[in-house]
UniProtKB/Swiss-Prot annotation:
This is Photosystem II reaction center protein T. It holds the Pfam family PsbT. It comes from Bigelowiella natans (Pedinomonas minutissima). Keywords: Chloroplast, Membrane, Photosynthesis, Photosystem II, Plastid, Thylakoid, Transmembrane, Transmembrane helix. PANTHER family: PHOTOSYSTEM II REACTION CENTER PROTEIN T, PTHR36411. SUPFAM superfamilies: Photosystem II reaction center protein T, PsbT (SSF161029). Found at the monomer-monomer interface of the photosystem II (PS II) dimer, plays a role in assembly and dimerization of PSII. PSII is a light-driven water plastoquinone oxidoreductase, using light energy to abstract electrons from H(2)O, generating a proton gradient subsequently used for ATP formation. It is found in: Plastid, Chloroplast thylakoid membrane. The chain crosses the membrane at residues 3-23. The gene is psbT. Its main location: plastid.
Length: 31
């Protein structure tokens, strides 16, 4: 159970950082 919680927190932090960088700059990769 602890491993699942740690993986969830890791994915959550990476997701927040990714979305913050993605929405901060214009999406140049899609073009």
């Amino acid at each position: 159970m602890e491993a699942l919680v740690y993986t969830f927190l890791l994915v959550g932090t990476l997701g927040i950082i990714f979305f913050s960088i993605f929405f901060r700059e214009p999406p140049r990769l899609l073009k």
